[in-house]
Structures are given as C-alpha cells and as structure tokens.
Amino acid sequence: MKETTSPIRHSSSARTRSPELLLPAGDPEKLRVALAFGADAVYAGVPKYSLRTREIGFRRESLEEAVTYTHRQGKKIYLAMNIYAHNLKVDGFLNELDRVAAWEPDGLIMSDPGLIALALKRHPHIPIHLSTQANTTNWTTVHFWRDLGVRRIILSRELHLNEIAEIHQKVPDIELEAFVHGAICIAYSGRCLISNYLNHRDANQGTCTNSCRWEYKLAWEKGSILEVEKSQSPYETTIPIPDGFTLSEPKHHHEKMPIFEDTFGTYLMNSRDLCAIELLPDLVKAGVVSFKVEGRTKSAWYAAMTARSYRRAIDDMSAGQPFNPDHLRDLLTLSSRTYTTGFYTRNPRQYGENFEDGYSAGFRYRVTGILKSYDESSSMGTFEVKNRMKTESELELITPRETIPFTLRVMENLKGESLETAHGGAENVRILLPQDPGDYAFLRQKTE
C-alpha cells in the first residue's frame, strides 16, 4: 500500500469468532456474484428511499425477487431506506415500508429518527440498522438508539479502533457494523470536513469557520495569479490547470494548497479508498460483528474480488491463521485511488488523500470476460467480452475458490466460427477452458 503508516497491530493467531461479511448489491447480477464469491449478507437500496437513488439497479419487483433469492441461498439481505425525508415523502415512504416489510428482509438500514420510530411501531419484528449517515461516534448515542429499539449501529467512518472498543464495552448488547473497504466521502450535507481540513476547526464539534465561503486565489508556482473572467453562467468558465498551481486564502496566504488535475477532473480533496483487510482481527477484538464493503455503484468484478479477498481473510482469521498478503495483493489489482486504513489507527491527515492517482490505480490487470454459461461436453465457456482478448494470450480464470492461469487456445463466436480476436462490447464468445468454472467466473489478463 502506498501510504506511509504506523505499524499495524496484528492480533495473535488464537482462533477468532467469524464476523459477517456484508457486500453491496447494486443490481441483481452483483447480488448473485457477491453471494457466490463469499458474502454472508448483502445490502441493496429501495428505489426512491435510499441514498443511491440515481444508481439503483433494482425495481420493486426485482428487489422482492432478490430477497427471495438471497434467502434461498441461506444468506441475509438488508434493505436501505435511509433518506432524510421531507414532508412530501413521508406518506409515500410509509406505503413503501409496508410493502417492503411483507418481503421479510433481514433488516432495514435507516437514518431518519422519526421514520425509524414509525418503522419500529408498524413492523417491530424487522430489525433496524442505523445507517452510517446518522453519524454515530460515541457510546451515549449508541445507548440512545439501543433503548429506542435499533438492533445494529453502522458506525461512523471517523472512529478509531479504541473508540469502537469503548462503545462495545459500555453498550455490549447491540451489534456494531463497520466499513472495511471502499470509497470514503469527505462530507455529507452539513457534516462537513472543509473547515477541519483548512483551519483545524471541526464543524461537527460546533467550531465551523465557514471555510467554504472564503475567497480563494488560484496561483502558479512562478508567482503569477490567474484572474478568471466572470461569465453570465458559472458553468461556462473552464481553465486547464498545469502542474505547479495552488489555492490560497488571503488571510492565510502563506498556506498553499496544491491542485492536481487529470483528464477526469481537478482534485482539492480526493480521499484514498478505505482498505482495512489487515485490521480485521483488531476490529473483531473491538466488538465489530459485521464487516461492510462500500460500492453499490461498482462493477460485478469489484463485488467478486472484494468478496473473495475478505472471505479468505475472515476464514484465515477465524481458523487462527496469520494474515496472508495475497489477499491484499488481489485487492490491489482493483481500480482504486490507492488505499488507506482511514481513522482506525490514526488521523490520516495528508496520507488520507491521493492526488497522484486521482482516478484509478488498479492498472496491473484488466477484466476481459464474464462467464454466462458453461458446456461440460465441450469444456467451452460462453463469455460476455469486456475488453480485448486474443488467442495465444495468457489469461486467468477467476472463480470463487481459485485463480487458474491458462493460455487462450480456442475462441469462437456463437456460430462456431474461429476467432483470433474479440473486442469489448461485441457479441459473446465461446472459449475453451482448462476446467469447469462453476456458475460464476471471470477472465482477467495482466497489462504489464
């Protein structure tokens, strides 16, 4: 991992109880993949009433089917209804709540105190999990929610391991869930970190300096100031930013904040992604019973690799085995902004950000295909092509249990005609595989 960190404390090799591995389900395919690759449970958003409304890959009918499918696999599904509702949405929310409750999900992820109280009154048999959006950071708040009837707290990402342990010690009779992997938000609504970042005054503690309202100057390292001409529309001005530019605020002109820009945007606060796979024993020791992976908008490949890596790490930990670095290496092949352990071991400060790799650091491998079916008689697998594949190239077949290297010898279209090359987005192809991949598998190829 690229971050310079203090040494990570590993627990002893004594056998540890196995926590829940909770994966995101952005759509039906990702749900099935997550469960196949090792998730104990998944979470999905209810259309219109969760915080990923625009990216939800479920409709009401498919979400009900997802609940049924998950239960048939002997696993759990939690449904997010964690909006903070305005008056206009309350009646609709309650109607949808009644429909969802009839499906008997294993829990509802909620934030709004009033809606939580109504849900507990209308459907007391369905566990309520308090969303991380509720910003739970201390044991007194956990105590309050437990007394109200909430069964699980999804902890704020800003907590240190020691703080989690104290919460568990003082309120032991409630489940604690913690994020272990995925993107990290800098701010949510009024819960802003800009003042803390720029002026060391925490808005969440009542000391906001309104840093977002300050006047800022854009400066080049040679000392010149760029004057941006105002236009009729604030969206019409775009200036490419080369290396060496900084932002400063007149009252703190000596403090220069570097700006980096690539083809995907300009980054003032670009958090690294969370990866706490090496801290799982410490999180269990602190009282966490569910490890949550962020990423409902990520790909099925992301769901597969995070599920498999954390499943293996949890199983090793539960069996008393030391941490296997191969689990982290697999995560490093995913697209990310490089990794940080967040606040679990310290305040990350500048090490929590990554400007050099603003968009994707997972460049060593690319996904070339997703398995759609397998014919045992011919040993041929039908794949959706995601990226260019060529015969005689070296590929890896990724299954829930194995990584199988092989040389691509035979590839054909669905008519049985031989192919030398297949391109992403084209029609599906059939490939001769070294073994039966099972129901779910991917192909990947090294890019170096």
Predicted regions and their residues:
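Glycine-rich, positively charged N-terminal anion/phosphate-binding segment
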Residues: T53-Y69
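Alpha-helix capping and helix-loop boundary segments enriched in small/acidic/polar residues
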Residues: R54, T132-T136, L155, W301
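Gly/Gly-Pro- and Ser/Thr-rich, intrinsically disordered tail segments characteristic of DNA damage-repair
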Residues: D91, H125, L130-T137
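Alpha-helix capping/helix-boundary segments
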Residues: G114-L115
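Surface-exposed amphipathic alpha-helical tracts and adjacent flexible/coil segments at the periphery
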Residues: K2-H10, A14-A36, A41-K48, A66-V67, ...
